């Protein structure tokens, strides 16, 4: 009998990817295809749902055939996806009635302000763990119902279906038979009660969204049903679903309360496992569901940083200081420190834990002696400082002292950044051998559901360290660095306040 593999589908914001994993958690094959970003007007971001499906189906087939395999070699499929992105389709035709409204889209910001003015903020946070924000799916659904001709009436008749990207993929993989999502994706809609684990009728009424549109909510690791498309000749169990950041937390094996991961991408996404009890944040973090496995729900605290790796892209594209992102480490390493220069990369405001939409990027402490190397180092340092702000908020909310930080994402390959992160935190930054942790998490969830892997203990034994960064900076020096950063953030906020 031929070896079998787990196929992980990683449907991201800019590309659809597919990876095959073997029993040791190694990547056997990978395929990727980018798709179009649609910007109808400033602040609006859309995707074509049919292109999401066609690119994802295409790379799924390519990842399998590239290594001479076919569908019979796939034991199960796990799906992970860009979260919050909203698709509404006609149940009869299977066709979307509007483009996917992407998580970054801000068109419903004014409507969110109206909901806040109605005094709904505390109710929404208590039920969903989320602040009222256009980032989440609820107001995007409402916009489609209000602005697409005939949508409201079709919804009333039960003819429309809503789904996050995972739901849309499962719907298509099962030839329109399964309309499901998992608890992690449901918890990002602003409509799901994370305590009762059900859609919340009070919130649905407040937003005038019919319950009939919503998918059935299932666990993150269970057999939802078999594929029925021509993508694969054989029927393969769809057996794992989780939003991208939750999948990364699972792929990093942060399965115990107090374990934390940071994904260093264009932005940073930090997530702390808080165990089987949701912790309501008092420090501007989001309370969310980490996963549901073996009947148990794990919760998490999450903080999002808008600009992380994007600050390196700005040095490349905006200032021309570097020709490629990979050059920044060598340039920054040319100086021992920033010489008092601080960059606050609030290009689109400040995310967690500040949540200041008006703050703008600011540079402080520049002298005639400041060089491109100092700027490069300040840019890298800003990623670590912002991450520290979120991690301190997590410690304050949870009462848990972080033992180590598990890192992944593109910028985690930067050794200078990882060392400075460890220095600031005072604990080790730990980089795994396999940094494709999002796809790995989806594979793990699917494999557990079908018995490909026996239990989480087996997965823990597979997790392998690539490098551990131990703190080496003196406490006095760390304190001085942090004091400067905090002054810079205060000044960036003051600048925004003074320009209203």
UniProtKB/Swiss-Prot annotation:
The UniProt note on how this protein's activity is regulated states: Inhibited by fructose 1,6-bisphosphate (FBP).
* Catalytic activity of the protein: glycerol + ATP = sn-glycerol 3-phosphate + ADP + H(+)
EC code(s) of this entry: 2.7.1.30
Identify the keywords attached in UniProt to this record, alphabetized. ATP-binding, Glycerol metabolism, Kinase, Nucleotide-binding, Transferase
Where along the chain is ADP bound?
13, 17, 266, 309, 410, 414
Q: Carries keyword NAD? A: no
Question: Could you say which residues form the signal peptide?
Answer: none
Chain residues that bind glycerol: 83-84, 135, 244-245
Pathway in which this enzyme or protein is active: Polyol metabolism; glycerol degradation via glycerol kinase pathway; sn-glycerol 3-phosphate from glycerol: step 1/1
Where sn-glycerol 3-phosphate binds, per the record, is at: 13, 83-84, 135, 244
Q: What does this protein do?
A: Key enzyme in the regulation of glycerol uptake and metabolism. Catalyzes the phosphorylation of glycerol to yield sn-glycerol 3-phosphate.
Tell me the protein's name.
Glycerol kinase
- Which gene does this sequence derive from? glpK
